[in-house]
Amino acid sequence: MTQKIKCALIGPGNIGTDLLAKLKRSPFLEPVWMVGIDPESDGLRRAAEMGLKVTAEGVDGLLPHVLADGVQIAFDATSAYVHAENSRKLNALGVMMIDLTPAAIGPFCVPPVNLKELVGRKEMNVNMVTCGGQATIPMVAAISRVQKVKYGEIVATISSKSAGPGTRKNIDEFTRTTSGAIEKVGGAEKGKAIIIINPAEPPLMMRDTVHCLTEGTPDQAKITESIHAMIKEVQKYVPGYRLVNGPVFDGNRVSVFLEVEGLGDYLPKYAGNLDIMTAAAARTAEMFAEEIISGVLKLEPVVA
């Protein structure tokens, strides 16, 4: 039996609950704590039924148990507003943070684009951008590694049912964080992000549109090849990630149309936005966990 790295999840909402299902299947990670603020929360109840320790007293309810229970990685699926404080408290105990909020106090992580580099830098807080960012930035990066992208714009459409209260509270942060990551990770000179929450019934599957303006005339063959290679990389951890149409070339504009089907771990398969976020976070934590298990990475307390 391989040694597993013990994890805590903060935020028992849609994202936290979906992530828990994925961590339960991980060969390297063992979820042991679920942290919430509402004792009546469905997510806390579910986690307790799965055998996790739970607290409804927020991160402060977890802190006294971190060292005794050997927690080394924590996932924050709460809100951008509280993440900095959560991270400070846990980093001080030597716990690495995987941030699933748009707080972005640590470097952005989009696994197929820059995960290996971040593991090598021994970061103690990495930010998973947003669901729209995880779905689209690999495509921007696939184009920008072929030639310079002057402008990258993404439109993420998610079903209303898949957007919980935390996601709704963080809409402005979603836009800012995703735009920044299109530039920093995707490689576009200027980035723009738009999110649409669609109330249609039955709920629609997550759809994403990516438009990039290249500096010169797009090299169609190379860009097409690069996009298909990148899609295969994303499909390694999100099998329901699909190219619906494209790349479509129109002058200097390259457009890619995607849909993301979820595994249906917590919400039904239309909520691919949960999957792309939680699967990317689990993939990231697994890479760090492998380094910890092999002795290459030693987590040290961070003094604030």
Swiss-Prot record:
GO molecular function (one): NAD binding
Q: Which UniProt keywords apply?
A: Aromatic hydrocarbons catabolism, NAD, Oxidoreductase
What EC number(s) does this enzyme carry? 1.2.1.10
Judging by the UniProt lineage, the source's domain of life is Bacteria
CDD domains in the cross-refs? ALDH_C
User: According to its UniProt record, which reaction does this protein catalyse?
Assistant: acetaldehyde + NAD(+) + CoA = acetyl-CoA + NADH + H(+)
EC top class, as a word? oxidoreductase
Question: Which InterPro entries did the record assign?
Answer: Acetaldehyde_dehydrogenase (IPR003361), Acetylaldehyde_DH_C (IPR015426), NAD(P)-bd_dom_sf (IPR036291), Semialdehyde_DH_NAD-bd (IPR000534)
Q: Which residues bind NAD(+)?
A: S162, A163, G164, P165, G166, T167, R168, K169, N170, N273
List the GO biological process terms: catabolic process
Its family? Belongs to the acetaldehyde dehydrogenase family.
| Protein name per its UniProtKB record | Acetaldehyde dehydrogenase 1
Native species: Dechloromonas aromatica (strain RCB)
